[in-house]
Amino acid sequence: MFEGFGPNKKRKISKLAAEQSLAQQPWVEKYRPKNLDEVTAQDHAVTVLKKTLKSANLPHMLFYGPPGTGKTSTILALTKELYGPDLMKSRILELNASDERGISIVREKVKNFARLTVSKPSKHDLENYPCPPYKIIILDEADSMTADAQSALRRTMETYSGVTRFCLICNYVTRIIDPLASRCSKFRFKALDASNAIDRLRFISEQENVKCDDGVLERILDISAGDLRRGITLLQSASKGAQYLGDGKNITSTQVEELAGVVPHDILIEIVEKVKSGDFDEIKKYVNTFMKSGWSAASVVNQLHEYYITNDNFDTNFKNQISWLLFTTDSRLNNGTNEHIQLLNLLVKISQL
């Protein structure tokens, strides 16, 4: 009577559930490097870290560089090779930007984990992994920590260095206090070159059977500005959109630009032409229409910067003045000022140059 619910049926259900979970997983996680050999274009860091696998003598580390260059992926790949998937659960503490980063979290959560006695590995883990006698605390986006929290962290690093190693990850190394940075081995993660990034995007699109028009992957890379994580996410979002359009539909550059919130080139040229006219009423009218269409003023600032600064038709003095106006507007937008007013002010001032 209950034959259909035997062990074989349960295994099939479990396998199906695992496949569905993998299919729904973000591609950023699905294609994250599983070991150091899979880390792309960070040869120096990978070479040095591979040596630690042989000696199991790991220093405190500071990974810094632009977003989406593999900093977090590299330390996670290293910990997998050091401990294996099972022991990692008890040996690794990872805190990221979603966690409280003040002095209290350092004094409580970080300190409590750092002082724990290292658990004994299983026989299986010892046979297959180095399993060094220390834990690792990964602090992602450490440059967002307050100076007081960083000072408290320095004392914790000194006290528990016998049983705990720290890996600090940040975009801006200058925001890490010197007493903390001096206790770490620094690894600079450079922005991925175009060929490596394109190869990775092409590999993922082939694995996922995603079809793209010519130049789409290059456009994704251009929009993501070297951030491979953002590029992979954008590729996945575009693939979902193409699926809804029906079988055989390719991802187009237009779809990618719409998903990324990029202002289309023809609209950007219209803005430039309105600025050239120098007519305040025309500029004001166009800005009103533009903002009602839902475009972002920040995107316009970035694209105007690219248009004017890379254009050889403008002299150096004009570019200097444009750069200052764009910098001022970008700063004000980041401080939360009104987008409509700032965009209007920017375009009017450019028209007066």
Curated annotation (Swiss-Prot):
Under the heading InterPro entries, the entry gives: AAA+_ATPase, ATPase_AAA_core, DNA_pol3_clamp-load_cplx_C, DNA_Rep/Repair_Clamp_Loader, P-loop_NTPase, Rep_factorC_C, RFC_lid
**Which NCBIfam families does the record match to this protein?**
PRK00440.1
UniProt subunit comment:
Replication factor C (RFC) is a heteropentamer of subunits RFC1, RFC2, RFC3, RFC4 and RFC5 and forms a complex with POL30/PCNA in the presence of ATP. Component of the RAD24-RFC complex which consists of RAD14, RFC2, RFC3, RFC4 and RFC5 and associates with the checkpoint clamp DDC1:MEC3:RAD17 complex. Component of the ELG1-RFC complex which consists of ELG1, RFC2, RFC3, RFC4 and RFC5. Component of the CTF18-RFC complex, which consists of CTF18, CTF8, DCC1, RFC2, RFC3, RFC4 and RFC5. RFC2 interacts with ECO1.
Q: What is its main location?
A: nucleus
What this chain does, per the entry, is described as: Component of ATP-dependent clamp loader (RFC and RFC-like) complexes for DNA clamps, such as the POL30/PCNA homotrimer and the checkpoint clamp DDC1:MEC3:RAD17 complex. During a clamp loading circle, the RFC:clamp complex binds to DNA and the recognition of the double-stranded/single-stranded junction stimulates ATP hydrolysis by RFC. The complex presumably provides bipartite ATP sites in which one subunit supplies a catalytic site for hydrolysis of ATP bound to the neighboring subunit. Dissociation of RFC from the clamp leaves the clamp encircling DNA.
| Membership in a protein family | Belongs to the activator 1 small subunits family.
Instruction: List the GO molecular function terms.
Output: ATP binding; ATP hydrolysis activity; DNA binding
Q: What taxonomic ancestry is recorded?
A: Eukaryota, Fungi, Dikarya, Ascomycota, Saccharomycotina
Question: Can you say what this protein is called?
Answer: Replication factor C subunit 2
The organism named in the record is Saccharomyces cerevisiae (strain ATCC 204508 / S288c)
User: What keywords would UniProt list here?
Assistant: Acetylation, ATP-binding, Cell cycle, DNA replication, DNA-binding, Nucleotide-binding, Nucleus
Q: Name one GO cellular component term.
A: Rad17 RFC-like complex
